[in-house]
């Protein structure tokens, strides 16, 4: 391994068809000519991606890592630790890469600004079936696409996990990815968390306007049911960031029971509303708050256990 390599890191778990599509588009976009190494980090104990990596060795430089523990952030930390001096472009296993993106990331790799910058580009969407118009406001940027508005500072909108890059040395310095977050864990929050830490260490986020990558969105990833599951996980994440140092009832702050009752009442009152958005909105608000309540109980329980063990 050279002192500084350019790595394209793809964490995957049991999605061979989508992974093949991603690698194929990397090859078509000229990843071999750009001098990058594709690293597939398969987590969850399976090795289904190993034959695919072997198959593409004649098309690009590609390496494979197998990890027993499940979790995207665990897989990405493994890549960071294995390629500690490298520049790492993080992609999801369900994206379509453009030639312009490959060229844009190669340029910033060659600039070698370790300890100064990290990078991200816009995200387009390859959608299997467009969602209902009213549902779009509840969908994450990974399902609707993202392009930094002109004049906005990049720190106001964190880069999406399907298309961003940083030097491994900078990620190691800030502690890497939080393995309690991300797909396989909470399902949300991993890239925002690590980018916050990079900014806290003094790095500047740089937007690569031409580095377009397209994210595949199947119909079940932009459905009301999927959005509600995500809202629950978002509630858990937000709950974990709040200090609940107040009187408790059954392991939870008392005011939460009052708020939960209010939200439950709103949901029940709209169960038969003719407006699907109104029905969904009250369900979303309730489910988000239930996730928040669950995390509050878990945190206080873990704090109590820690106190008991120390006695």
Residue map of PLM features:
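A conserved acidic beta->alpha catalytic loop
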Residues: 40-51, 95
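Conserved donor NDP-sugar-binding/catalytic core segment of glycosyltransferases
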Residues: 100-134
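Short, flexible, basic/aromatic active-site loop/helix in glycosyltransferases
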Residues: 122, 138-157
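Non-catalytic, C-terminal membrane-associated alpha-helical segments of glycosyltransferases
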Residues: 229-234, 245-311
